[in-house]
Structure formats: C-alpha cells, structure tokens
C-alpha cells in the first residue's frame, strides 16, 4: 500500500502541458483551450498569428522548456506540425529528452504502447509519401523529356523575378522551421557561453556534444533567431580580445559551463580528444591542470567557485 501511495504522489505524476495554435483565418482558440483543460492540462500555451507565418515563438520556447516526464498535449496534429515528417522530427527530439506527446483527436500518445504503434504507422506513411513524391517527380521529368520539354519551373528557367523570389522565400521558411525545431538542442549552450566566449570555442564545445557546426553557420543561425525575436541580441555582441595564453583557461571554463556535471577527469578527456596541448607540456591532460585553469577562471569571475 505504501508503494502505491508513493507511485501516485503528485511529484511523480506527469505534467500535462497544452499547446493551442490559432490563425486569423481559423478563430477557434477557445474551443482548443476548453478541450485541453478538459484533458487535464494545468498549463496551456497559446500561439496567435497568420496561417501563412512559419515563425512560432511560443512553441519554440515551450519545446525548450519542457522537462523529462512532461507530456505535450495538442487538440489535433496539425496544431503542432505542418507535415508528417516535421511532426516526427519534433516527437523524436522530445522522446530523446524523456518528454511524451499526446494528440486528443488522433490516436497518438507516446507514453502508451498503442500510441507508439500509431506513431510508427505515421512514420511508415511519411516514408511512403516521400517515395511516391520522388516517383511522381521522376515520371514527370521522363514524360517532359519524351515530349521535348525541359523539366522544372518555367519561371526559374526564364529567370522571372517573381519565381525567384517565391523559391527564395520558401527556402527561408524551411530554414527557419528547421532552426526552430533544432534550437532547443544547442541554443541553451550558446546562451550560457556567448558573448564571453569566442564563436570558435562555442563551436568546438557544441561539436564535442554531437553537433556539426561551423562558425559561419552557427553565427548565421543565431542571427536569424535574433531577427525573428527568438533569441537575445546580446548573443551577437563582439567578444573581447584576449591574449593567446588566455585561450586554454577560457576553453576549459566554456566546457565546464556548458556541462556543469563534468568531473575534472571528464574535462581532461575532452581536451585530449580536441587535441589541445596541455599548458606545461606532456602528452595527456591531468585533472590538476584542469583544476588550475578553473581556479584562474574563478578568480576573474568567469565561473563560480
């Protein structure tokens, strides 16, 4: 009995967090909110905007703030994602962080076996959809070639300005969508390190954690999020120039700030893998060398003691 009471304690119950999106063309937000409340959502985040707009700052912040054990709840799948592949990307990222997803009007609940099966069916549908699109595109190109016509967009071939602008705008929208989905995996680290650390060091730390950034691509990504008011302008401030001997101290401090749970030995191992030479020679980094650099960083206020 004591075990049952423990398992049913409020601290272990899942937090149901709702997300409602309404466009100017579909003003049904109250109905969404009512359904989410009836489902037990104790917090509901509401997004307002044009149906044509891909920027969703409320959703971006919500995805970043969700914690392990939370359940993100929507009324319908189309309230969260614009396509099956986009939906699967979002859910996959949530699952990696221990966050579940539920759609009230669809058989999707990733905290249950049946819901996960439905999600796998959706994945198969998305794969089939991509294959059919590729097959139709290939057939269309072959038919056009047989009729002596060039495949592709006539407006682009003729360099019509309106066609070029439309394609450029579509690419920018797709780029922003990808950034918003992925930002929760890298933007918190950028926020902790910039602008006190150089872009070079930020990129090296992110890439050690499984990312694949270059300085140019990361700066462009942060610029875009700042422009959309999804990130703080201070992230783009110029880093102060530091003497060369300052480099190792700041790199070690950056690694420690990015992941406070790392031990001195863990940081030393990362520095070895990054092929950074120890400050006093030798072939491998020692925890004592890491400790000395962290003490120095603490003295100037770069990290907390």
Curated annotation (Swiss-Prot):
Signal peptide stretch: none
Domain Resolvase/invertase-type recombinase catalytic: 15-148
Highest taxon of source: Bacteria
Keyword DNA-binding: yes
Keywords: DNA integration, DNA invertase, DNA recombination, DNA-binding, Plasmid
PANTHER family to which the protein is assigned, alphabetical: DNA-INVERTASE FROM LAMBDOID PROPHAGE (PTHR30461), SERINE RECOMBINASE PINE-RELATED (PTHR30461:SF2)
Family per record: Belongs to the site-specific recombinase resolvase family.
Protein name (database record): Probable DNA-invertase y4cG
Organism, scientific name: Sinorhizobium fredii (strain NBRC 101917 / NGR234)
């Amino acid at each position: 009995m004591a075990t049952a009471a423990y398992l049913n304690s409020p601290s272990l119950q899942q937090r149901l967090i709702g997300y409602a999106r309404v466009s100017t063309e579909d003003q049904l937000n109250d109905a969404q909110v009512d359904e989410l409340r009836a489902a037990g959502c104790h917090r509901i985040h509401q997004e307002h905007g044009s149906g044509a707009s891909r920027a969703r700052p409320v959703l971006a912040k919500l995805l970043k703030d969700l914690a392990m054990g939370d359940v993100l709840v929507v009324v319908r799948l189309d309230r969260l994602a614009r396509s099956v592949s986009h939906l699967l990307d979002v859910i996959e990222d949530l699952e990696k962080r221990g966050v579940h997803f539920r759609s009230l009007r669809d058989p999707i609940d990733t905290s249950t076996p049946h819901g996960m099966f439905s999600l796998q069916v959706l994945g198969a549908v998305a794969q089939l959809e991509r294959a059919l699109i590729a097959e139709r595109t290939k057939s269309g190109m072959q038919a056009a070639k047989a009729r002596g016509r060039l495949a592709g967009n006539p407006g682009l071939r003729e360099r019509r300005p309106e066609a070029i602008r439309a394609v450029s705008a579509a690419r920018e929208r797709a780029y922003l969508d990808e950034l918003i989905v992925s930002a929760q995996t890298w933007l918190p680290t950028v926020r902790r390190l910039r602008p006190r650390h150089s872009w070079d060091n930020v990129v090296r730390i992110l890439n050690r954690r499984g990312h694949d950034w270059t300085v140019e691509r990361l700066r462009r990504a942060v610029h875009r999020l700042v422009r959309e008011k999804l990130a703080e302008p201070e992230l783009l401030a110029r880093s102060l120039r530091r003497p060369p001997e300052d480099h190792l101290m700041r790199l070690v401090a950056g690694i420690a700030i990015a992941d406070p749970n790392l031990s001195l030995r863990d940081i030393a191992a990362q520095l070895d893998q990054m092929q950074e030479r120890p400050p006093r020679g030798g072939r491998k980094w020692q925890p004592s060398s890491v400790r000395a650099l962290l003490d120095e960083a603490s003295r100037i206020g770069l990290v907390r003691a």
